[in-house]
Amino acid sequence: MIKVVFMGTPDFTVPVLRRLIEDGYEVVGVVTQPDRPVGRKKVLTPTPVKVEAEKHGIPVLQPLKIREKDEYEKVLALEPDLIVTAAFGQIVPNEILEAPKYGCINVHASLLPELRGGAPIHYAIMEGKEKTGITIMYMVEKLDAGDILTQVEVEIEERETTGSLFDKLSEAGAHLLSKTVPLLIQGKLEPIKQNEEEVTFAYNIKREQEKIDWTKTGEEVYNHIRGLNPWPVAYTTLAGQVVKVWWGEKVPITEPAEAGTIVAIEEDGFVVATSNETGVKITELQPSGKKRMSCSQFLRGTKPEIGTKLGENA
């Protein structure tokens, strides 16, 4: 039986681990990030992958730094024939990459060489792409730069969010891995080098990227809101207060107005001008310190005026 070590951390990777188990491989160990404090009460919480591994009685390693010798030697001691990684969250050292008979492969949520990095799902939507996909490739020390083994495309729908696309790609990744591993073991795959001239990056989202830039086009603002839903959530400011924007709709604007200005207030939301003739009607939001709510609920208690400017004093 093929011995496999799986390395992964978030929800996205749980179906991948589950599929390895279902396909009959001997998963001899799981490597994931350490438990972290979560929520206001800072409750120490295991990663989703650790929870799944423990359901199946699989040994779990949680190195703080996988590149340290005493940590990676614990992985090598498991003597895997194959290592599968998916959103593990640390750079894996060569000592691990070169050890398994069948190599170390990674399940990445983009059509490489596009969108290397830790947030490819967010960027695919924020950049307005109509398709993305899954790439399975050999791992190298350089970020997401290994030779490609297999790929599958996934359509991005008009109202897609990072949350919905996350679920689709998670299942697509598990399915593609299930088809890829047997071909890899049988030596039936021809690795393809990535075209370095076509490389783009999707680095982890920073706080300053979450703020809506109303000077962009309506389409770009709409994509920004979708791409940060349901985490970390786009935000703007209204009357100097931070407001998270969970959802908005593209609407035509007939009268020119300064970007970021409220140009209409309707029953289900208020329309904000952008840099072109497409505005964004905010329909779901979350004022600072309050729960997520529909804009119609918000407007029952707060009455912004037409001409109010959003995005100031952030």
Swiss-Prot record:
Q: Name one GO cellular component term.
A: cytosol
- InterPro entries, per database record: Fmt, Formyl_trans_C, Formyl_trans_C_sf, Formyl_transf_N, Formyl_transf_N_sf, Formyl_transferase-like_C_sf, GART_AS, Met-tRNA-FMT_C
Which species is this UniProt entry from? Answer: Bacillus cereus (strain ATCC 14579 / DSM 31 / CCUG 7414 / JCM 2152 / NBRC 15305 / NCIMB 9373 / NCTC 2599 / NRRL B-3711)
Query: Some GO term, biological process aspect, for this entry: which one?
Result: conversion of methionyl-tRNA to N-formyl-methionyl-tRNA
UniProt GO MF annotations: methionyl-tRNA formyltransferase activity
Q: What is this protein called?
A: Methionyl-tRNA formyltransferase
Functional note:
Attaches a formyl group to the free amino group of methionyl-tRNA(fMet). The formyl group appears to play a dual role in the initiator identity of N-formylmethionyl-tRNA by promoting its recognition by IF2 and preventing the misappropriation of this tRNA by the elongation apparatus.
Task: Recite the UniProt keywords alphabetically.
Answer: Protein biosynthesis, Transferase
Q: Which sites bind (6S)-5,6,7,8-tetrahydrofolate?
A: S110, L111, L112, P113
Lineage top rank: taxon: Bacteria
The enzyme's first-digit EC class, named in words, is: transferase
